[in-house]
Amino acid sequence: MAFSKILPELLGEILQYFRQDYRILYSCILVNRLWCNSAIPLLWENPFSFMRPKNLHFIEIYLYDLNDDEKTKLIEYGMDKNLFPSNTLFKYSSFIKHLDIYKISKSIEDWDRTLATKNFRKSNFTKLICRSLIQLFIENVANLHSLHVLYGSFDDIFELILQNSNFIGNIKNLQLSHLEMSVSIIKFLTFLSSNCNSISSLLYQCYNHYEHQQMMGNGLSQIIKSQKNLRKILFRSPLYQSLLSLKNSNCSNTLNTIIFYYIEFKNIIILNEVFNQLNVLESIHIIYCRYLDTKFVQQIININKPFKLKSLFLHEVSQFEPLDLLLQHFGCYLENFESRVDSKPQLLQLFKSVTKYCRKIKSLYLHLLWDYRNINLVFNLIENIKQSLNYLSIDLCFVTDTKNDFHSIILQNLGQILPFKLEYLNLCLAINESDLEIFLKNSQNTFIKELSIKNESHDLYVTIYPCIKEYIMKKKKVKYLTISDKFNVSWFSSKDIEEFRLYDIQILKYSYMRNFDVLYKGDLSMLLW
């Protein structure tokens, strides 16, 4: 009862803390009118992107606000008129903050399947619903904060958004993904550079032919130059023009984070020239990039401005010596590391260097492709970063090991070296009950907020449920749990899910969390909107 009398300003801060936990927010709306009025906007600012299992009937609640003509069109497509609510308590469409057009379309398709109406799935139905919802958001003067445009999901509502420039005029986070050259895309990029100058986070990925790169680069450069408060940017391609646009730009005193994503640095020689003009640069992130050779590393090392290398994700190592030099200079700042390297000699050298120079890693993702005789290097690395480690993933999906010895050694030795608390642990291993029991017994001192297990065992009849029930459910050692087989089929029945819920443990569908996602876990500024 005392909690229901919290001051409104304090209540707002409390609810903001739980904005990613929809179950808690749902509980809050039941407390009293004040709590309800404060929690509802948070629940409805981004309903299409809930990472947890969601009730797709929220789409029907949106449809209540459509005008009669639009409702008639949907009924003509076969929609049951009884699906429209008789009334609603709020103008829910006015609360939308984050617009991901692909996720809207996907949610509509999933909702359509749940209705299972034979005449319902006509080809243009999803497009019609999507366009109707966007029109609804515009009409209700939604104050849009984030926009994600994905190639193929945008054409049908492109003109609708351009005709209502105020709708996206104040966006702070812009994500342009998988774009290809077209008249509409160039028109949209021009529109953004002229009408949206308050973007703080920009993610830009395009896949276009070489002859179109200059036009796409020009479009991105104009957007960058027009910004007044750009703080974070992700480059994929084209790099040269867009990177050069940072020189003498408005963002020289605002840009603090640069992410290089799948970039080939082979002919890039302007890093020093550009970075030395960025006065508040704090960190760079190198994600699956190529040609991290001596020429690249020397450019990075010779930059005069102080900054930190926060992330390094590798899928190949062409030259180890430059990489070792990079780790010597920046390893003490490294927080996110992933290895997909399949060359055994280079991988062994890499693990030794990371263990030696990097002691502050928070998220560690390992795709191990080599034999168990060197597994102590993995254990040494985990032990070395134990105090800072929050996210850990170990994937042995592609290890050829007929007896599963490598998998067993991991399970039998991992539990005792884990920190006292982990936000996330993902294990993709061939698992048997005895090895899992050893792991769970040894990790009893560790609370794991989200435990994700994918059993790669070829024995489809192996049963680990009693072990899970004994050491996880009854001891309440996790908050979220997902277990699946190698075909991503969940092992839990509806009865199991309800039983775990009694112990305050939520069963999720298997969804592998990439290390790249961890960079933005709980941060709506970029990927996880």
Describe the predicted segments one by one:
Residues 16, 20, 37, 98-101, ...:
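Ordered, helix-dominated protein-protein interaction surfaces in large eukaryotic regulatory proteins
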Residues 19, 23, 40, 44, ...:
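Short amphipathic alpha-helices and their capping/turn residues within compact interaction modules
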